[in-house]
């Protein structure tokens, strides 16, 4: 049965009606969690707020979590250094942000590899996906849980329906060699730019377009300074909740086990809701007057064919076995 948008929104917002950063008591282990999104409309922000609530209720006296959203403490380009320095204990950067720690996560940037978020979930839950969490252990970074955002769409200051429409345009990308290659493959000019700078870049026409999820496009108001957004679903934008191996190994066993259990339960609950949150943000954009375009099957196939060579370029870094496992995850 159809639910009014306001009722769906209310059910999602119900989990985010929490207090600001907690006041920790003496003797409690302080867990600072820095991230870059809002707290009430973004999958990561909602999950972080729920995690904070549960830790502070269920681990009261043992541990205390403080969440710092909207890049108020660190942006994703600096948070990993802060993590290794012990200035924060938890972060959840996008998987594209781990380039200097491992090349394995490049698999998540390959265009049109995953059919949908459910396929991503199956891959991350597989043995190969579990192995990826430990890909940075030697560098002092421990992966804990994968968090979903959603599939990426393309927006620009002109209509984009086929790859040729993007030729010559400047697109903001994360600091990922795969994403650079993706836009170069279709004749566009990729520009590495931080999340926080992207709206200004679009507004001042330093860049012409960008790729992102519905929640980021709505939450950062990119749709206000673009001609429209094309629903390409060409890639996944996900996060990895990480901590420093040193901090994690130094926790008392009971604290570590209880925290890991809570984090896993929050992950399962919120990942199951990610598609609903993304669809909600898409509708927010439409209701606000934003233009959303869809592709015909023939147009989509043009994108798939144009971007397939990117896979071959990075297969050696990623591993053919991982790519095969990802493709297998598309089979339900």
From Swiss-Prot:
Superkingdom in the source lineage: Bacteria
Compartmental location: Periplasm
Its job: Part of the tripartite ATP-independent periplasmic (TRAP) transport system DctPQM involved in C4-dicarboxylates uptake.
Subunit structure: The complex comprises the extracytoplasmic solute receptor protein DctP, and the two transmembrane proteins DctQ and DctM.
Position of the signal peptide: 1-22
NCBIfam families in alphabetical order: dctP, TRAP_S1
Family matches, as Pfam families: DctP
Name of this protein: C4-dicarboxylate-binding periplasmic protein DctP
Annotated family: Belongs to the bacterial solute-binding protein 7 family.
Gene Ontology annotations for the cellular component aspect, listed alphabetically: outer membrane-bounded periplasmic space
Species in which this protein is naturally found: Vibrio cholerae serotype O1 (strain ATCC 39315 / El Tor Inaba N16961)
């Amino acid at each position: 049965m159809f639910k009014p948008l306001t009722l769906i929104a209310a059910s999602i917002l119900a989990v985010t009606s929490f207090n600001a950063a907690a006041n920790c008591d003496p003797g409690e282990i302080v867990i600072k969690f820095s991230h870059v999104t809002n707290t009430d409309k973004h999958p990561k922000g909602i999950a972080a707020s729920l995690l904070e609530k549960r830790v502070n209720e269920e681990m009261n006296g043992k541990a205390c979590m403080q969440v710092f959203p909207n890049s108020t403490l660190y942006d994703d380009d600096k948070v990993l250094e802060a993590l290794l320095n012990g200035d924060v204990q938890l972060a959840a950067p996008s998987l594209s942000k781990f380039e200097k720690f491992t090349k394995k996560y490049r698999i998540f940037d390959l265009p049109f590899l995953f059919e949908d978020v459910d396929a991503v979930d199956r891959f991350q839950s597989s043995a190969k996906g579990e192995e990826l969490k430990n890909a940075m252990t030697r560098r002092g970074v421990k992966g804990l849980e994968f968090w979903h955002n959603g599939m990426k769409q393309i927006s620009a200051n002109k209509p984009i329906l086929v790859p040729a429409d993007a030729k010559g345009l400047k697109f903001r990308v994360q600091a990922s060699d795969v994403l650079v290659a993706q836009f170069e493959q279709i004749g566009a000019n990729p520009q590495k730019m931080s999340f926080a700078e992207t709206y200004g870049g679009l507004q001042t026409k330093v860049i012409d377009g960008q790729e992102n999820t519905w929640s980021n496009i709505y939450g950062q108001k990119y749709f206000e300074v673009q001609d429209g957004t094309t629903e390409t679903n060409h890639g996944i934008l996900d996060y990895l909740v990480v901590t420093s191996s040193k901090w994690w190994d130094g926790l008392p066993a009971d604290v570590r086990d209880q925290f890991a259990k809570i984090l896993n339960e929050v992950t399962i609950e919120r990942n199951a809701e990610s598609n609903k949150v993304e669809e909600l943000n898409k509708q927010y954009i439409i209701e606000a007057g934003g233009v959303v375009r869809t592709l015909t099957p023939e147009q989509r196939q043009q994108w798939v064919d144009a971007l397939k060579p990117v896979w071959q370029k990075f297969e050696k870094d990623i591993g053919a076995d991982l790519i095969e496992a990802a493709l297998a995850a598309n089979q339900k």
